[in-house]
Amino acid sequence: MIFKTLLTSVAVSMAVASYAQAAIQDGTFEGTANGKNGPVTVAVTIKAGKIANVKVVKSGESAMIGDAAIARIPAEIVARQSLGVNNVAGASLTSMAIKAAATNAVKAAGGTPSEFYKAPIKKPASNIDVSYKTAVVVVGSGASGMAAAVRSQLNGNPTILIEKMPYLGGDTILNAGTLIATGSRYQREVMHETKDSPALAYKDIMHVGKHRNDPVLVKMVTEKAGSVVDWLIDDLKIPYGPAATQYPDHSASRQLGVEGRSPNFIRTMSRIFTDHGGKILMETRATSLIYKGGRVDGIHAVNSDG
C-alpha cells in the first residue's frame, strides 16, 4: 500500500510538471514596461518551453547609456534562461524595464515567470593580472578624455583609453554637445562673428558663474577654444554647426552644436580613435597611480572581472 501511494504521488508530480511545461506556448510574444524615458517593449520568442530569443523592439531610452543595457540584458536572459540577470551598471532603470517587459511577455505566452527566475550571479574576482605597455593612458571617456585620447593617438603616441562604465561618454553623453567657438576660423567665416574674443568670453563665463568658476581653467578654455574647434571641424570633420539657440548669457555669437548631439560626437570620436589604432578598455576603473622616479609612470586599474 505504501509503495502504491508513492507511485501515485510520483505520477501526480510528473503530471503537474508536464502541465506547467505545456502551459507556455511556443511563438513570439511582446511585453511592455516603463523605462527611464518611457515605455520599453520587448519581444520574447519561446521554443520548446525555453526562451530562445529576447529583443527590445521599442525604446526611447538614452542613447549609449540605454544601449548598453539593450545589448546585454536580452542576451544574458537567453544564456541563463533567467529573468533575474544582473542590471547593467549606470543603466539600472533601463535594465529593470527590459526584465519587467520580458516578464510580461512570458506571461503573455502563458508561462509562469517564477519558473524562469534564477538569482543573479555574483561573479568571483578572477584575480588575473594583465599588463599593458603604452605611451599614454587616458582615464575617462567624456568629451575631454575622448578628445585627449584622439589627439594623442593621431600624434603618434600609442594610447589606451579606459572607461569604468559599460558605455562611452561619461556625463557628456547626457548633454546637448554644445561648446563655444571663440577665436575659431568657423566663428569668423561661417558665423560671421568678429567682435568676440577670449577676454570677452572669459568675462561672460565668470559673470554667469557668479565668479565662482576657477579663473585659471576659464582662461585656459577661452584661449584654447578656437584651436580646438578648428581641429574638430577642419581636421576631424566632426559635424558641428551654429547652435539652434544662442545662450542669452553670451554677449557674442559663439555657441556651437554637434549634429546628433553628444552621443554622435562620442561615437564619431571613438571610431576615429580605434580606426587609428587606439585601444579602449570598458568597465575598467582606475584605482591608483604608479610612480617611478617621482613621476607618474602608469596606473593600476580593475575591470568587471576583478
Residue ranges and their predicted role:
Residues 23-120:
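Active-site- and interface-proximal helix/loop "cap" or "latch" segments in soluble metabolic
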Residues 78, 82, 103-111, 154, ...:
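Sec-exported extracytoplasmic/periplasmic mature domains
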Residues 131-161:
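N-terminal Rossmann-like FAD-binding beta1-loop-alpha1 element of flavoenzymes
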Residues 290-306:
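Conserved beta-strand-loop-beta-strand element in the redox core of flavoprotein oxidoreductases
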